[in-house]
Amino acid sequence: FIAEDAGIDTLLVDFAFIKPANAAFFNRFKHKILVRGEGGIEPLGEGVAFDEFLQRGKNNSPTHTRNPIIPDVILYTSGTTARPKGVMLNESHFWANTEGAMAHVPFLKDDRVIMALPLFHSYGSIIALIALRGGATLILSRQFAPKGILGNIAKYKATILPLAPTIYSFLVDLYKRGGYDVSSLKYCVSGSAALPVALLH
């Protein structure tokens, strides 16, 4: 629905997500850019690998005139009450969001941020922009797995963990069983829904 509603003609897709069951969907797009990784199949016919896509580009950066009120991104709502709706966001929106968040939680160049949030939602995309703006390192999670999140905190000495309250409840229950080192964390950021007081404590 979203692809048709937004009139998308170019798809940037991780190779691992290409399966026989969804090959027909991917082949609907005029242009396909494939990010090579583990897994995946070769059903797409025409397409270009991401590295090749970058090599084909010109070395000089194109001239870009900033206009903070022109829409840059269309993010779709979750569609819990009706069909998802495309929300047009511009540079001013993203700037205000990142400024407001960084006033409370500074993301610095030495920080390592666990990114287990979906990047196609506003919460995840804003957190990613804040981290990049502050020069922090993003530790991307391919899928939601509580054990994987706790394991990555210890493995990469993560300092910032942004999640939704529901996910925190899973992690707290798992953490109570022992065996996970989260001592490197400086901030746990909660968003997308109200955080219950009991969970906070």
Residue ranges and their predicted role:
Residues 11, 71, 77-80, 113, ...:
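Conserved S/T- and glycine-rich ATP-binding loop of Class I adenylate-forming
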Residues 13-23, 39, 117, 144, ...:
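Adenylate-forming
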Residues 63, 75, 147-150, 177:
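Short hydrophobic/charged patches on amphipathic alpha-helices used for structural packing
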Residues 95-112, 120-160, 170, 174-175:
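Conserved AMP-binding/adenylation subdomain of ANL enzymes
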Residues 27-32, 136, 183-186:
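A short helix->loop->beta-strand "cap" motif at the edges of active sites that frequently abuts
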Residues 51-76, 83, 106-112:
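Conserved pre-ATP/AMP-binding loop-to-beta segment of ANL
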Residues 1-52:
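Structural core segment of the AMP-binding/adenylate-forming
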Residues 72-96:
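Conserved AMP-binding A3 loop
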